[in-house]
């Protein structure tokens, strides 16, 4: 394994040693000229790279609604329109309630006139 690692890192003129210590453990080392060492790709991502990826993802975020793709901004605009429609519907409900009360008042007056 140690020789494989040395070949991978391209170390030339290398001397290795291994010696057993009195406590039963081993001491191992090497000495040589390092011509070229290649750094392997790591699976790690920096915070800056992650932030860039997340920003791109947020900008390209798509939501599928009833077989139509909508961007986040269009989705927010539709949310505002829905809120406005709900407010208008409440106002119409109040107006209808006032009309119903007025008709009930007229109906009571007509009943009084008929009873006389």
UniProtKB/Swiss-Prot annotation:
Bilayer-spanning residue ranges: none
Entries under InterPro entries matching the protein: DUF16
Disulfides per UniProt: none
Family stated for the protein in its record: Belongs to the UPF0134 family.
The name this protein goes by in its record: UPF0134 protein MPN_038
């Amino acid at each position: 394994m140690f020789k494989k690692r040395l070949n991978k890192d391209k170390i030339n003129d290398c001397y290795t040693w291994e010696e057993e210590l009195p406590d039963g453990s081993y001491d191992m080392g090497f000495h040589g000229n390092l011509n070229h060492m290649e750094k392997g790709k790591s699976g790690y991502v920096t915070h800056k790279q992650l932030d860039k990826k997340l920003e791109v993802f947020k900008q390209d975020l798509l939501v599928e609604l009833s077989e139509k793709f909508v961007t986040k901004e269009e989705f927010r605009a539709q949310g505002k329109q829905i809120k406005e429609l709900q407010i208008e519907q409440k106002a119409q409900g109040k107006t209808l309630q006032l009309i119903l009360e007025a008709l009930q008042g007229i109906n009571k007056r007509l009943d009084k006139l008929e009873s006389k």
